[in-house]
């Protein structure tokens, strides 16, 4: 059985425990063993420590990666920010010996060292490459037949592509999330703003008006071009932003429709028959109708 260190990150732990429940449900059922990585901390993501202290950022990231390296396993996350931050920090250490040396000097004060072997995989890539589309199809009890999905890979699933361990994805024409959704039975057509930012992160904190404008433009594009029944994302931040912001836009009269939003692991958990209240129970935009449709599509 393949084993990964489950790196939750702050966002999922504090805001979306249903995503954590989904991961803990589907991966053992798909033959992936999870290690809790006791002692893990914030990754830390862009806009925080990386903006002011490169070595400090890399040291925190390396400490997290070392928790896996000590056990001979890679990390796995459902958070694009964690995925990007941990892998970019690793890339900086592997390409800059001086940063790597300084990081290990810091880690030595707590009895740790990071050689650069352990990396962070994204749940979508683990599902796509380790599990595989055929096994995924065989593992589900319910399908997405008749459901049109708008995929939202999110910025940090795609960029900076050179730092990621799985390099097969074309960030300008991403296929992994679309093919995973299609394996579940969905139609996942292209739409113009597919790779555009959701407006989360520092932008939402510093300029919410611009942040919500990006959501409005993306939502209108999804509605007009593919009239999606569901938005599926690989990113916990995109999940929160698209779920919450569209409700605000509706209340302000800026859009007059709603599209439920789910993380990929939540969709798979629903298709595998896990309890909807546990794996998809937190939302702002209503989900009951789409969950009902999924559970009516019994194989």
Curated annotation (Swiss-Prot):
InterPro entries tied to this protein: Cys_rich_dom, HdrB/HdrD_reductase
Record-level GO cellular component terms: cytoplasm
Ranges annotated as spanning the membrane: none
Keywords (A to Z) from UniProt: Cytoplasm, Oxidoreductase
Main location group: cytoplasm
Subcellular location: Cytoplasm
Pfam families: CCG
GO function term, MF aspect, one: oxidoreductase activity
EC number: 1.8.-.-
Description of how the protein assembles with itself and partners: The heterodisulfide reductase is composed of three subunits; HdlA, HdlB and HdlC. It forms a complex with the F420-non-reducing hydrogenase (Mvh), which provides the reducing equivalents to the heterodisulfide reductase.
Known function: Has oxidoreductase activity. The Hdl and Mvh subunits may together mediate electron transfer from hydrogen to an unidentified electron acceptor on the cytoplasmic side of the membrane.
Database matches in PANTHER family: COB--COM HETERODISULFIDE REDUCTASE SUBUNIT B 1 (PTHR42947:SF1)
Family to which the UniProt record says this protein belongs: Belongs to the HdrB family.
Protein's recorded name: Heterodisulfide reductase subunit B-like protein
